[in-house]
């Protein structure tokens, strides 16, 4: 008989770790939480992100063994100088942290660690302690130091300008108080900028647009289908490809051994990613199914008065009786738009195996809930939901992404590796 779970806990087999329902779980969001549509240009201080400093002679090789992206250049074997997006996995290949990695100059690290570059690791602020524990667990005898940066040491900013591809001239090797990183998780999504403190005066040119709220950045991210932070990426349960980390440039499938690589490579070369995080739009049950915007993403309405489901709610077919089979999991939302983990062949017209698809364009999907006095939900409710595939995501899935660039040697090496893994299993 399986052990009983404590009230409010989550089974380890559940795909997403979610909080228990609260009394406000199904209430319409407050107006303050529903920002206006994102401006064409703007900048936001990301107070929900934090930085960890990693320095030392072994810092590059240490990171190389822990993250999904290739730290060392395959040709020159040199340490990187350009920031990049990457993930930390556990030994089972499940996602622990989504991060941006910023190489720093030796002088910034005090000049006492030889000529090895140091690194700043940007991570979900709520996960700093967990990532520090993860680094400490794998440090062993490596010559390195790590610490969480104090509040105010450096600020993380998101910057965008839809009218032009903004890029500051103040790169890390010109002005050490400023480090920039192209955010390539979606086309023309913008930049990350690290500033010493929050002093915008350090920049030789102003950031584009006006300073906006964190909810504005979150809305823009949701519309582009970008999950961020462990509330959205399913810590220790989701595969990195489920959260589109491959599409967003966070995985190097040609890289050598790193923690969690086996399942990642096996899924890439021999498996099919059947579920992915997609942007979704919510609408009332009596309303017609919404159409995407001209750019293929949901249409946001700041005036929406929908009753909203909580994170982790099941998505089912509207025609299904009772609970029905899950077509996806709702993740997060602002107003009438959000993110959901969707079964591609059920909720979209994507065919993964070349066989007949389960998708029916006339089919609609719903999220239903029942009254729960203990949770403060006075009455039952239901909203409909439709998923959208941003054009760059669809193109990657249909054309195989990086698989198109595999050589025969890559395929043979992957096949040999996965056969060995299966023998060990």
From Swiss-Prot:
Annotated stretches, region: Disordered: 403-425
Entry GO CC: mitochondrial matrix
GO function terms (MF aspect): transferase activity
GO terms (BP aspect): iron-sulfur cluster assembly
Subcellular location: Mitochondrion matrix
Transit peptide: 1-28
Keyword terms, alphabetized: Mitochondrion, Transit peptide
SUPFAM superfamilies, alphabetized: Folate-binding domain
InterPro entries from the UniProt entry: TrmE/GcvT_dom1, YgfZ/GcvT, YgfZ/GcvT_CS
Similarity annotation: Belongs to the GcvT family. CAF17/IBA57 subfamily.
PANTHER family membership: TRANSFERASE CAF17, MITOCHONDRIAL-RELATED
Stated name of the protein: Iron-sulfur cluster assembly factor IBA57 homolog, mitochondrial
Gene: CAF17
């Amino acid at each position: 008989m399986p052990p009983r779970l404590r009230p409010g806990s989550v089974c380890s087999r559940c795909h997403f770790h979610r909080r228990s329902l609260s009394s406000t779980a199904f209430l319409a969001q407050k107006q303050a939480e529903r920002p206006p549509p994102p401006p064409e240009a703007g900048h936001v201080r990301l107070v929900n992100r934090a930085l960890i400093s990693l320095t030392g002679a072994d810092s590059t090789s240490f990171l190389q063994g822990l993250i999904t992206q290739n730290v060392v250049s395959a040709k020159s074997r040199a340490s990187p100088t350009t920031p990049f997006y990457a993930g930390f996995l556990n030994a089972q290949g499940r996602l622990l942290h989504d991060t941006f990695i910023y190489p720093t100059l030796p002088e910034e690290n005090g000049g006492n660690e030889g000529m090895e570059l140091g690194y700043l690791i940007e991570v979900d602020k709520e996960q700093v302690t967990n990532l520090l524990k993860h680094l400490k667990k794998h440090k062993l005898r490596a010559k390195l130091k790590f610490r969480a940066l104090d509040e105010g040491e450096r600020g993380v900013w998101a910057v965008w300008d839809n009218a032009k591809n903004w890029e500051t001239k103040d790169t890390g090797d010109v002005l050490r108080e400023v480090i920039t990183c192209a955010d390539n998780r979606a086309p023309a999504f913008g930049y990350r900028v690290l500033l010493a403190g929050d002093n915008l005066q350090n920049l030789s040119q102003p950031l584009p647009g006006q300073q906006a709220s964190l909810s504005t950045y979150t809305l823009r991210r949701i519309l582009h289908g970008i999950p961020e932070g462990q509330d959205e990426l399913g810590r220790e349960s989701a595969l990195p490809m489920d959260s589109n980390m491959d599409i967003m440039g966070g995985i190097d499938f040609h890289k050598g051994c790193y923690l969690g690589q086996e399942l990642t490579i096996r899924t890439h070369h021999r498996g099919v990613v059947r579920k992915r995080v997609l942007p979704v739009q919510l609408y009332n049950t009596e309303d017609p199914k919404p159409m995407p915007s001209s750019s293929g993403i949901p249409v946001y309405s700041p005036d929406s008065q929908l009753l909203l489901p909580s994170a982790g709610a099941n998505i089912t077919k509207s025609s299904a009786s009772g609970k029905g089979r899950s077509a996806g999991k709702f993740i997060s939302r602002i107003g009438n738009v959000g993110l959901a983990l969707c079964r591609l062949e059920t909720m979209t017209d994507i065919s993964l195996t070349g066989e007949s698809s389960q998708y029916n364009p006339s089919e609609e999907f719903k999220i239903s809930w029942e009254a729960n006095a203990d949770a403060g939900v006075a009455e039952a409710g239901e909203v409909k939901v439709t998923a959208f595939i941003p054009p760059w995501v669809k193109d990657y899935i249909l054309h195989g992404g990086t698989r198109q660039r595999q050589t025969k040697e890559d395929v043979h090496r992957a096949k040999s590796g996965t056969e060995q893994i299966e023998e060990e299993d």
